[in-house]
From Swiss-Prot:
Membrane topology: Lipid-anchor
Keyword Transcription regulation applies: no
Keywords of the record: Cell membrane, Lipoprotein, Membrane, Palmitate, Plasmid, Signal
Annotated protein name in UniProt: Uncharacterized lipoprotein y4eE
Length: 358
């Protein structure tokens, strides 16, 4: 059974897609791609709730690399995510947690960061769920970049890459909108949880893959999968005052420092946002991969976290059709975005066949 959007591709775009496929030639199916992606996991940052007899539960964020638990402030809010059966943390304003070890990543090699966030029914004014990387090129550490989502009542529309302008120290921040914020979601029920993969490559690019799951008939998961590539990675590109007329000169990042969870403030600098924020609305965890994930590896890893009969390693993002013309397959079905195939039972039994040439 064939499912997906169908559109016509010019030869130049097909060549580009073919080049991307050759880079990911090391894996070709769900099993192989999951194995290669899992081998790149170097660190996880996971919220934990530990019951304490005769007292309130203790809240921690567990760092797998340092094998340590970081205590969060007593005023941290908890939101239980029934879709994932996990607890998300909303840190109080101006709060952040710095990991005790240097991040085990290299800008020269590239890396991927996965954020898991609960956004539906979990929004706060001026909120922004963020994870940042500190530079250790001077005694005054500063934020090199921050990652996260600015949630709204329809959280899947508001995923951002947040980058900080750099001088001697970062003083200001700007939001980059990676895709059309008015994209329609699938016609099922938005599950309220989002998985966002930020893949940094040595050429100074960051690829963002956002998966927002929707449920059908209380059993089947379908994804709204959006993707964008931005100049927001390493080396970092700051803009002078005013509208830029060409590509700015790169700024040397310096040595990699620790991660900062929350990013409402950093040592030796002013807060990166103009107003105080609740640092982590809906933070369910972060996974750091020590090397960049290919598109197929991202899909395979996501399927291992929340499997879907409508997501296959040979597919392309749902928003591909906005920029390409040709015949491709996405997880968003054949009708309006997100509609599953009409015969769900047959898909459940036989999975999906695709017609994507990569």
């Amino acid at each position: 059974m064939i499912t997906g959007k169908t559109i016509s591709l010019p030869l130049s775009v097909i060549a580009c897609l073919g080049a991307g496929a050759s880079q990911a030639a090391a894996c070709a199916n769900q099993t192989d791609c999951l194995k290669s992606a899992s081998a790149k996991v170097s660190q996880t940052l996971t919220p934990k709730v530990v019951p304490v007899f005769g007292d309130y539960p203790k809240l921690y964020i567990h760092d797998s690399a340092a094998n340590e638990d970081y205590t969060v402030p007593d005023t941290t809010k908890q939101e239980f995510d029934f879709y994932t059966n996990k607890t998300s943390f909303n840190l109080p304003r101006r709060s952040s947690i710095e990991t005790r070890e240097i991040a085990s990543i290299s800008p020269a090699m590239g890396f991927t960061v996965l954020l898991v966030e609960k956004t539906r029914d979990n929004t706060v004014s001026n909120g922004g769920s963020t994870l940042s990387l500190l530079s250790s090129n001077s005694n005054d550490a500063y934020l090199s970049f921050a990652l996260g989502a600015k949630p709204s009542s329809s959280g899947q529309k508001w995923s951002f890459a947040k980058s900080l302008l750099q001088g001697n120290k970062a003083q200001t921040a700007y939001w980059q909108k990676p895709w059309d914020m008015n994209l329609l979601g699938p016609t099922g029920d938005f599950s309220g949880t989002e998985w966002i993969y930020y893949t940094f490559t040595p050429d100074g690019k960051v690829r963002i893959d956002r998966f927002a799951p929707y449920t059908y008939f209380l059993a089947f998961t379908a994804y709204q999968w959006d993707e964008a590539v931005l100049d927001g990675g390493f080396p970092h590109f700051p803009f002078d005052t005013g509208t830029p007329t060409n590509r700015p000169q790169s700024v040397t990042f310096g040595s990699v420092g620790p991660w900062l969870i929350g990013a409402a403030g950093a040592p030796g600098q002013t807060p990166p946002t103009s107003e105080p924020i609740e640092a982590l609305p809906g933070f369910e965890g972060a996974t750091i991969f020590s090397a960049p994930l290919s598109m197929k590896e991202v899909i395979a890893y996501q399927n291992s976290l929340r499997g879907s009969y409508f997501l296959d390693v040979d597919m392309l993002p749902c928003n591909s059709g906005q920029y390409l013309s040709g015949r491709i397959s996405t997880p968003c079905g054949t009708g309006s975005p997100g509609n599953p195939p009409p015969n769900i039972n047959s898909v459940a039994q036989h999975r999906i066949s695709t017609n994507t040439n990569r």
